[in-house]
Amino acid sequence: MAYVKERIYESMFIIAPNVPEEERENLVERVKKIIEERVKGKIDKVERMGMRKFAYEIKKFNEGDYTVIYFRCDGQNLQELENFYRVTPEIIRWQTFRRFDLEKKERKAQREKAAAEATESSEGGSED
């Protein structure tokens, strides 16, 4: 079994509330396309959380449209995503971070599955 340096990331971004709904959808699609094409990642899950109020004012807005994307990649091209966020004025906040907890949970599940398969194959081979 070859070890792949694939890591799990979570990227959350907030779109300004004055952006029309159709443009917000297009922006989410553009982010997904950047993750798949430029970052060379594989998207696991997209959560559209909708409009939420802020605890404090951000760029003169009191609310924004939240989206969270979970994806896998080797991490080498993440700067492409950060650059896109930085130059897109409709995105007023963003944060991307590695999810060590999800990676750990996944590795544990893989080890348990491998152990169960090894147990099954050793039991199946000893029958007369």
From Swiss-Prot:
What is a single molecular function from GO for this protein?
small ribosomal subunit rRNA binding
**This protein's superkingdom?**
Bacteria
Which InterPro entries does the annotation name?
A: Ribosomal_bS6, Ribosomal_bS6_sf, Ribosomal_S6_plastid/chlpt, Transl_elong_EF1B/ribsomal_bS6
Q: Name one GO cellular component term.
A: cytoplasm
| GO BP terms, alphabetized | translation
Keyword annotations: Ribonucleoprotein, Ribosomal protein, RNA-binding, rRNA-binding
For the keyword Kinase, the answer is no
Instruction: Please report which protein family the annotation says this sequence is part of.
Output: Belongs to the bacterial ribosomal protein bS6 family.
State what this protein does: Binds together with bS18 to 16S ribosomal RNA.
Protein name, entry field: Small ribosomal subunit protein bS6
| Taxonomy of the source species | Bacteria, Thermotogati, Thermotogota, Thermotogae, Thermotogales
